[in-house]
Structure formats: structure tokens, C-alpha cells
Swiss-Prot record:
Assembly and interaction partners: Homodimer.
Keyword Transferase part of the UniProt annotation: yes
Single GO molecular function: ATP binding
Active-site residue numbers: K10, D141
One of the GO BP terms on file: isopentenyl diphosphate biosynthetic process, methylerythritol 4-phosphate pathway
Top-level EC class as recorded in UniProt: transferase
Similarity remark: Belongs to the GHMP kinase family. IspE subfamily.
Reactions listed under catalytic activity: 4-CDP-2-C-methyl-D-erythritol + ATP = 4-CDP-2-C-methyl-D-erythritol 2-phosphate + ADP + H(+)
Pathway where it operates: Isoprenoid biosynthesis; isopentenyl diphosphate biosynthesis via DXP pathway; isopentenyl diphosphate from 1-deoxy-D-xylulose 5-phosphate: step 3/6
Record keywords: ATP-binding, Isoprene biosynthesis, Kinase, Nucleotide-binding, Transferase
Function of the molecule: Catalyzes the phosphorylation of the position 2 hydroxy group of 4-diphosphocytidyl-2C-methyl-D-erythritol.
Pfam annotation, one family: GHMP_kinases_C
Protein name: 4-diphosphocytidyl-2-C-methyl-D-erythritol kinase
Amino acid sequence: MRTQWPSPAKLNLFLYITGQRADGYHTLQTLFQFLDYGDTISIELRDDGDIRLLTPVEGVEHEDNLIVRAARLLMKTAADSGRLPTGSGANISIDKRLPMGGGLGGGSSNAATVLVALNHLWQCGLSMDELAEMGLTLGADVPVFVRGHAAFAEGVGEILTPVDPPEKWYLVAHPGVSIPTPVIFKDPELPRNTPKRSIETLLKCEFSNDCEVIARKRFREVDAVLSWLLEYAPSRLTGTGACVFAEFDTESEARQVLEQAPEWLNGFVAKGVNLSPLHRAML
């Protein structure tokens, strides 16, 4: 039997770089919220212990794909602790709607969905804490998708405090370019010393993203989309880009602006949600 699992997008409602560690990783403060929009992962169990991704990504080797890496990591961790039923395997496919290099967390969300779904389907019985710890080895954003609640994140993104920001409507626009995260984080002009503040203080301030100035400077497409969106609503970059978003109080307001978008702008309208669609599907 084939089952389907949501793999939602996220937005960084704000993102501040507070420092850089000796190992090169940047410390930050950010606010994650999910969208009721994303990829869909389909899983069909097999009994020969194999993992197969039926929808490969061009340019990414099968074993390097985060989906396959997540499945194999869960398989090894559960097996090492005697919690993997004999023969556990899976055929996995993905209906991909989220762009790569868009700042929407697509790859991290895919990995988290696979960890949560296979833990359930294989009946491994690992806790969310264990899954989140595994997820962190795959990527800094994976734990928030595993835990499934909007969160204030610190450290390199792994220290999570659940929060409930307003669930607004968003017009999310993709400028048509992909921005690899290292391009932003290695830029010498990236702000790296924004003062740390409490979540209470940050929620009262106007939200912004320290990466935005670099993305706008280096990618004229990002600058063009933001310039257009800012004529209609508060707008900013998510993550390290390339996607940008404008926030609205109602769906109709967001859709009216999308209808006026220039032909070169690709976008969608989605609602911000504090409970991940993945976890909502499991209730």
C-alpha cells in the first residue's frame, strides 16, 4: 500500500546573524513558520531491506539525495538499537513543488518527512528527540521540520523554542535563480555581529533578514522581485534566498497582488501555519 506524506515549506519570518564560530558555522536567531504548501512524498513499503528513490533529482547521485540519506540513517540507527523490523525497506517518490536553493527548506523538509514517516510505518518507536538529533546530522533546518511546530531558533538553528506567531497569508515569489547557501554566508560584507535579543524583544520589532542585503546586491533578480513586492506589502527574503515573500492579512489580498504580478515573476499564495501539515496529517 502506498501512503502520502506532506513535506511543507518554511519561511524565516526574521533572520539575524549574531556571530561566527571557530568552525566557520554562523550563529543566528531566526523565527521559523510553516506554510500549508510544499512537496508530497509517497512511500510504499518493501520487505527486502532496500531503499529506492523512484524520482531521482537531476545532477544528484541516488545515495547523496537527502531523502535516501535520511532513510538509511533511520534504518541504521533503529537497527543498531534493535528497533528495526527484519526486511524493512521502502520505495519513495516525491511530487516536487518547492524550488531548490529557494530558502523554503525543501530538502530539509523532505528529509524530516522521511524520518517521521518511516519511523511510523516501520514501527521503530524512536522519539521525536531521537529523530531531531538524527536530523541535525543531515542539516541544521531538519530538526524544526521533525518537531513540527513554529519555533524561535538559536545556535546554528538547532536550539528551538516553540512559539505561535500570527498565521498570516503570504505571497511567495521565486526570482528564477538558485542561491547556494555558502554564496551568502561566505560574502565578506554579510552582517555577522547583530546583537542577540530575547524572543520577546524580537517579536515586538520590525522583522528583517540580515542576508537580504547580500542577496539583493549579488542577484539582481532578487532585488527586482523585492522592489516590486514592497510596493504592495511588507516583504523580505526567506533564509538565504532566493525566494522572497510578502505578508497579508487575508488570502484575497495576497491573490489580488499575485494577479497583478509581471509575467517574469513566478509565485504562489499560502497560509502560514504553526503546526506542520505533516504533524497535522498524523493526528
